[in-house]
Structure formats: C-alpha cells, structure tokens
C-alpha cells in the first residue's frame, strides 16, 4: 500500500503524511477508494487477511477437547461497566462485512438444540428518553414510531412520509452520536459533510428534543461538582479528566460525563436481564442455557422442545429488567447456527 501513491501519481486533498510517507491507515484509504479502484482492492485484501488470521485461524486454535470455544467474561475492565470477553473475544465477531458475518455460521448448538438470539432494540436511546424525560422522544417510543425517521423529518424540514433513506441514515448518526457526546467535527467526519452543516444538524436536533440538551448540560455540570458520573442504578464512574489543566483532557471528561450515565445504565440493564434469564432457566428445570452476551444481545442454546418456554423467559427477563418511562423492546430470532439466529 505504501507504493500506491507513487504508482498512481495521486494528488490527495488533505492526504495525511507521516515520517515515512503518506498514511495508508484505513480511514485515509476509505476516503480514496471511490476514486481509485486499487485502493478498494487493498482494503478488501486487508479485510480478508484479518478475517483469516484473527477469526478463521485464530478461533480454530481456541477449540477445546469438547469441541467448544470457552471465552472469559470480565466485569471490571470496561470503564462504562459493560461486560467484556477475552481469550478469545467472542463479542468481536465482525458484523459490518457480509463475509465477516458468515463466520458465525461455524458456531452451532449441540444435537437436538438450536440457538435463540434476543437483542435489545435501541436500548441506549430508550434510556436517554427515560433519563432526559423529553416528551417528544417518550411519545414517539410509546407510539412505536420510527425514531430515526422522525428525527430526519424535523432536522431536514421534510414531511415524515417524504424522508429519504439517506436522510434517515444521517438522522440515525445524529441520534446515536448525541449519546456518545459527539462534536460537530466528529459528526461532519461521520457523514462526510462540512462542520457548519453538522453543527446545524445538531442545533436542529436539540430544538426538536429540547429536554435532551438540558439533560446533557446538567450531566456535565453535576459531574464537575461531584467528580463522577452515575448510572440510573447508582453506579459511579470517576472522571478525573474534568479537573485537568489540559483542554483536550477536559473535553474528553465532558464527553464521558455525557455518555457514561446512558451507556452505563444500558450495561446495568443487560446484566440484570442476564440474571433474570439465568434464574428462570434454572428454576424451571430447563436444559436450555445462556451461552453468550454480546453487548445488548443474549444467545441461548435452546432445546427444541423448550423453545416456547425460553421465548417467554427472554421476553419477561429482558423487558422486565428495568422500569422505564418507555418499554424495553427486544428482537428475537432462532436458527441452526449463530448466523441464522442473528
């Protein structure tokens, strides 16, 4: 890849140059790919090489005598409180590439069983609706409306039914970006638009959902006073960066203050759901068992004659994990392998 610039005689607006030449980092090449076919080929090759080394070869080396791969779950590694997976990391099976997703096909249940996958739907946005008490967001969820399409309609000033797929995708980036404390610069990079346009999108977003702006500002102010962020369930995350003399560190601390209560609450909820589901499977004497947690998703190895019971347990255990102003929702699927179940 390092010779690409020379061989193609590329003239790159804003091309990043390092000590050894122009950067060939993925984010740089992705911007070039539409104009230079060889760059797209390089990115594809890198992706395939990563799939082979990390997942095809890497996972095969982790298979134990019982034919299974056993991961380790960690409760205290991530700052947000999410459970992480190591040796190997089974929460990191790729989802962006179709070929990467197909790696999930190699994960199969034992004979007489199937996989049942239950995934929270927009849990962080639902937590935001509850914690901010924004009436518009709460009302949209209670009416089971398309949140991203509603946001697009408001931000881009078009009737709901005329929102394009592109506008909806951009609105989705704004909705989730707000949760992560995204800046106008960060949003402009994500959407390939100017910083001015991104700032206008965010301003219109906060006009649409005014209580969210007040809520986020309040989180930062409270964290400055106390030195920590707190989840809905009272779990604290210290934020020493807020008292730093370095502007960049303070800005980072402010983003933590914005997103930790939301992300952390979602992490708390999935843990409660795991306990609920595990207890119910045990109390009802089922042979089905909880295998894996991947962020907002639970994977159950389900005996085929216990399918309806497990569905009921997942519905109750996950939806009942927290009492919010809006209902928790899950998407549930079954399959003969992890790919089909997802």
PLM regions and their residue ranges:
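Function-dense linear segments that define catalytic or interfacial modules
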Residues: 75-160
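Conserved catalytic core of nucleic-acid polymerases
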Residues: 70-71, 75-78, 153-286, 292-293, ...
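Short acidic (Asp/Glu) and glycine-rich catalytic loops that position anionic groups and cofactors
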Residues: 3-13, 19-24, 83-84, 103-111, ...
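Structured core elements
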Residues: 11, 70-72, 82-85, 89-94, ...
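Flexible loop/turn segments at secondary-structure boundaries
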Residues: 80, 91-93, 123-126, 134-135, ...
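C-terminal structured "cap/appendage" subdomains that terminate the fold
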Residues: 280-331
């Amino acid at each position: 890849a390092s010779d690409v610039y020379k061989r193609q005689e590329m003239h790159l607006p804003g091309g990043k140059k390092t000590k050894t030449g122009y950067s060939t980092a993925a984010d740089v090449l992705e911007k070039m790919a539409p104009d230079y076919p060889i760059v797209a080929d390089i990115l594809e090759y890198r992706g395939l090489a990563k799939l082979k080394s990390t997942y095809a070869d890497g996972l095969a080396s982790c298979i134990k005598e019982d034919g299974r791969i056993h991961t380790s779950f960690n409760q205290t590694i991530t700052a947000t409180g999410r459970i992480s997976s190591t040796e190997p990391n089974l929460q990191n099976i790729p989802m962006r590439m179709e070929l990467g997703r197909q790696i999930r096909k190699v994960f199969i249940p034992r004979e007489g069983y199937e996989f049942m996958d239950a995934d929270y739907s927009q849990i962080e946005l639902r937590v935001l609706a509850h914690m901010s008490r924004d009436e518009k967001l709460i009302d949209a969820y209670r009416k089971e409306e398309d949140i991203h399409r509603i946001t697009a309609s408001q931000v881009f000033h078009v009737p709901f039914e005329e929102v394009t797929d592109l506008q909806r995708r951009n609105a989705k980036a704004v909705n989730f970006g707000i949760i992560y404390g995204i800046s106008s610069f960060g949003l402009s990079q994500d959407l390939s638009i100017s910083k001015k346009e991104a700032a206008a999108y965010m301003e219109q977003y906060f006009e649409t959902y005014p209580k969210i702006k007040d809520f986020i500002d309040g989180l930062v102010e409270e964290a400055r006073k106390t030195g920590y962020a707190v989840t809905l369930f009272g779990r604290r995350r210290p934020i020493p960066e807020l008292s730093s003399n370095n502007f960049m560190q303070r800005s980072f601390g402010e983003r933590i203050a914005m997103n930790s209560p939301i992300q952390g609450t979602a992490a708390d909820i999935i843990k409660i759901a795991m306990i609920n589901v595990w207890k119910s499977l045990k109390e009802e004497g089922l042979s089905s068992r909880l295998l894996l947690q991947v962020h907002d998703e639970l994977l159950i190895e389900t005996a085929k004659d216990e399918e309806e019971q497990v569905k009921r347990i997942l519905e109750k255990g996950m939806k009942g994990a927290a009492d919010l102003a809006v209902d928790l929702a899950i998407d549930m699927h079954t399959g003969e392998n992890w790919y089909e179940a997802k």
